[in-house]
Amino acid sequence: MNSQGYDESSSSTAATSGPTSGDPRMGKKQRFMNLIRTTKDVYIPNLTSSISQKTMDGIRSTTNSFEGYNDLPMELPHNTTITYFPTYTTTNLVDPDGLSAPRKDFETTVRCAVSYPGNPTSRRNRWLLSLCKQYLRTGTAEADVAPVVPPHLEEDSGDLNDSQSSIESSLSSKSENRYSHMGIQEEDVLNERIQGFLSKKVPNTPVVVDLLPKDKLRGDTASFFGTTDSYGNLLIKAETDFLPSKINITLDTPIEGHADPISETFPANYVSPYGIGLISDIDDTIKHTGVTGDRRSMFRNVFIHDVQSWVIDGVPLWYKTLHDVADVDFFYVSNSPIQTFTLLKQYICANFPPGPIFLKQYSGNFFSTIMTSSANRKIQPIANILKDFPKKKFILVGDSGEHDLEAYTTTALQFPNQILAIYIRCCSNSMSDVPSHDEEVMNEVNNIIELQQRPMQMTKSTVRTRRRPPPPPIPSTQKPSLTEEQTESIRMSRRNKDENNAKRVAPPPLPNRQLPNLDANTYYVPSSQNDYGMYGAFMDKKADEWKRRVMDSIQKLSNQDTTLMFFSDPALSLEDSIRRIREKYSN
């Protein structure tokens, strides 16, 4: 072919197949040309691609390492603090089958957070404080205050030159003259309680955890290492051959202006792997929060009201009685943000038995953190507790303000042999469309539970089996002889009977009929079917929804040895929980 129609593939084929003539020099030339062509077309591009790929991978890895390294705090602020979340130490149970890997005698769960106070003059924090103050002003409509922090203020942007007055004036000028302001004391309380939301978390901080033995003469110390996550939190599960009595936490990072690193020591809490445990919700279960009320009231309950105003009558007595009488261990699990830990710890320690507190880590909008919650968030920490104590029986206590019933039902299904009872506190305005009917609806759902969940107990207590009467004695075949007096007595009785024959005597009352166990659905008529007003005057959608939810939980728990009860008076739940514990121990 001519030069314009040069076929590279045919040339390559000819070169690889050998010279067409018998000249040996021609063969060497073709082999040399073929080597050059192969080197240029195949080897060099592959080598270049390989080098480029490795170079880019190296650049990316170097960049990533630098980016991660830049996240590490080279020097922590002098006011950095360690917040320790008390958890527990427990005994590792021996696997009877020997299938699991050998473990040490004790396991300790360590939880803490590293942070330092936020800059009060930063734009974000000034905006947040001003927004909270306006939101808490009496008389301000909720629509007047949009509880949203602008996206560019979600993260602390540092110390900016914007004056605080310019921001506060933009927020409060509309209501400056129309609404009353917060008192000085309330403002001080707000500033104190909101500090957890203003603080700065310290991520990627190396931490050293030392577990110290109870017996100082042993001299054993176990050290463990970890790094805080993106929220500044640390979770370590440490196994030891000895029972630790103290936990020493050290930040392995230089501190600004200090030669020694920050180090604090906390007590270790041992919890037996056996016995009874109680997992309790916090909001509207052991403290007045008002999740079912308006947002402003709930916000004031959390950030303004006195801590002792949170106490729900009867609940502290219930918990303390179980702790003192039945040696029950307590665990507190809530959707409250972890930034409120210090305040909740103060409240629980003053009114309830001590125990670890598990709160939720939130991020993003401050008001969304406070106002929103989901019972599903509590399932995982509850499951972790049950896994750590597989031989322990538990009581779950929640409230009707959230979906605690569904969360606890799911937990009982996942751990069928560990849940003794579920108690749901009836909150105000949560079970009926008419607030005054909450108690009535609660009694109705308890009746449904009684009929459905305890049919055997009801049958034994209300329906008694009758014994067959003994057979009559066999009459004697010998005819008895009567005296004259007996004969006269018989004659007189017959005459009296004839005289009174006209008088009808009322028949004796019929014996009580034995009623079969009736399904609770027999008594449940949804208000949606109440078209003619036969069962009520209005449609109570909340009540119908609660009956449906309760029936669904009862059906799921039909094969479980788990009792369910709604309560408004903690004295009734105290009595029932003591009975349930005694039944379990007596078996």
Curated annotation (Swiss-Prot):
It comes from the Eukaryota. It catalyses: a 1,2-diacyl-sn-glycero-3-phosphate + H2O = a 1,2-diacyl-sn-glycerol + phosphate; 1,2-di-(9Z-octadecenoyl)-sn-glycero-3-phosphate + H2O = 1,2-di-(9Z-octadecenoyl)-sn-glycerol + phosphate. N-glycosylated. It is found in: Cytoplasm, Cytoskeleton, Actin patch. Residues 9-22, 163-174 have a biased composition (Low complexity). InterPro entries: APP1, APP1_cat, Mg2+_PAP. A motif (DXDXT motif) lies at residues 281-285. Residues 467-483 are annotated as: Interaction with SH3 domain of ABP1. It is an enzyme of class 3 (hydrolase). Its EC number is 3.1.3.4. GO terms for molecular function: phosphatidate phosphatase activity. Residues 1-28, 150-178, 452-521 are annotated as: Disordered. Optimum pH is 7.5. Keywords: Cytoplasm, Cytoskeleton, Glycoprotein, Hydrolase, Lipid metabolism. Its cofactor is Mg(2+). Optimum temperature is 30 degrees Celsius. GO terms for cellular component: actin cortical patch. GO terms for biological process: lipid metabolic process. Inhibited by N-ethylmaleimide. Contains one Asp-Xaa-Asp-Xaa-Thr (DXDXT) motif, a catalytic motif essential for phosphatidate phosphatase activity. Monomer. Interacts with ABP1. Present with 2289 molecules/cell in log phase SD medium. PANTHER family: PHOSPHATIDATE PHOSPHATASE APP1 (PTHR28208:SF3). Mg(2+)-dependent phosphatidate (PA) phosphatase which catalyzes the dephosphorylation of PA to yield diacylglycerol. May play a role in vesicular trafficking through its PAP activity at cortical actin patches. Can also utilize diacylglycerol pyrophosphate and lyso-PA as substrates with specificity constants 4- and 7-fold lower, respectively, when compared with PA. This is Phosphatidate phosphatase APP1. It comes from Saccharomyces cerevisiae (strain ATCC 204508 / S288c) (Baker's yeast). The lineage of its organism: Eukaryota, Fungi, Dikarya, Ascomycota, Saccharomycotina.
